[in-house]
Regions:
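Short glycine-aspartate micro-motif
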Residues: 2-8, 60-64, 129-134, 140, ...
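Short glycine-rich, Thr/Ser-proximal phosphate-binding strand/loop in the N-terminal lobe
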Residues: 2-43, 51, 58, 77-80, ...
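A mobile "lid/hinge" subdomain adjacent to the ATP/sugar-phosphate binding pocket shared
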Residues: 14, 24, 181-255
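Glycine-rich phosphate-binding/hydrolytic loop that grips phosphoryl groups
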Residues: 19, 108-119, 261-317
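Glycine-rich phosphate-binding loop and adjoining helix at the ATP-binding site
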Residues: 34, 38-43, 50, 58-63, ...
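Phosphate/pyrophosphate-binding loops at sites that engage ATP/ADP/AMP, CoA/4′-phosphopantetheine
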Residues: 45-63, 104-105, 123, 199-205, ...
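Glycine-rich phosphate-binding loop of actin/hexokinase-like ATP-binding domains
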Residues: 125-184
């Protein structure tokens, strides 16, 4: 069977999927292993792809990789100075893919890939003015305007909503900024933000082996004072970031993804209420919906890009 191969290089796990006609035939995950170089990780990644193809007797028609950083999707280059893998900018990922499989290759930022996946196969269907925000290891964003992906001269446009400063007196972010949405309310910042609170030693959170958003929301529901405070701060940070995206890009719909959306019944009403209070246009109705493709939006987005190669690739992205 001929399939497109989608690879989503997330902050914690790398996901590999075989896609046929917009359907995932098979998928697997491997650890992101940020303590290795990208060149080392790519070899292990390729072995994982080949094993999945062999197991399901499939032949690749193209390889699409979603990468967690700023990328030049036209020249297929990694542009970020700060990326998960220190050698990433030195890797010619297009040549590596061609040498390994000899098939067409698509390359995109992971948030943009997720937006494309939701636009074509999930919560963004039938909507050409769309904002996606993913709440996970970091905070990723992407923007679609009139059916075209927003990129800008340096491929930054719409992609750095997680690095908008919302607290001038906040924590330092790993990007070098202060009080970014990401440093205020992302998974990588959560443990540090919680443990430095003077309320930590008397909070139930101090007994948790791992402090994550599931534990914060669980203890908040039980009335823990610190958990309630952290939950409110994070929801306000996420919503402030979303409002910044709305006033900047005027979307019809906002899609929120990431593992934290297990608590969507709490988060979505909170976000909607704050947006309504801060709307510039009377009766402006902006849809706020949870992502539908929580696991594989990036893989589906990359498989969609593969179908455009040689067709209307430029008109969409």
């Amino acid at each position: 069977m001929d399939v497109g191969v989608g690879i989503d290089m997330g902050g914690t796990r790398i996901k590999i999927g075989l896609v046929k006609d917009g359907q995932i035939i098979a998928a697997t995950k491997i650890p992101a292993s940020a303590d290795t170089t990208l060149s080392q990780r790519l070899n292990e990644l390729a072995d994982g792809v080949d094993m999945l193809l062999k197991e399901h007797r499939c032949t690749p028609t193209g390889i699409g990789i979603a990468f967690p950083g700023i990328v030049n999707s036209d020249e297929k280059k990694i542009l970020s100075k700060y990326v998960k893998y220190p050698d990433a900018q030195k890797i010619n990922i297009s040549s590596w893919t061609m040498e390994r499989w000899g098939v067409p290759f698509a390359f995109e930022n992971d948030a943009r890939a997720a937006l494309l996946g939701e636009w074509q196969y999930g919560a963004g269907r039938i909507c050409d003015n769309l904002v996606l925000i993913t709440l996970g290891t970091g905070v990723g964003t992407a923007v679609l305007i009139n059916g075209k992906m927003l990129k800008g001269k340096n491929y930054l446009a719409g992609n750095l909503g997680g690095h908008v400063s919302i607290n001038l007196h906040g924590a330092e972010c790993n990007c070098g900024g202060t009080g970014c949405v990401e440093s205020e309310a992302s998974t990588w910042a959560l443990q540090k933000n919680v443990t430095r609170s003077p309320k930590f030693n008397t909070s139930a959170l101090c007994r948790e082996e791992e402090i994550n958003f599931n534990s914060v929301f669980m203890w908040a529901a039980k009335g823990d004072e610190l958990a309630l405070e952290v939950k409110e701060n994070c929801q306000r940070a996420w919503t402030t970031g979303i409002i910044n995206l709305i006033v900047s890009y005027d979307p019809e719909r906002v899609v929120i993804g990431g593992g934290i959306m297990n608590s969507k019944d709490i988060i979505i009403p909170y976000v909607k209420d704050m947006i309504k209070k801060n709307s510039w246009i009377k009766d402006n109705h902006i849809e706020v919906v949870p992502a539908e493709q929580l696991e594989y939006a990036g893989i589906l987005g990359m498989s969609y890009l593969l179908t455009l190669i040689g067709k209307e690739y430029k008109s969409v992205i």
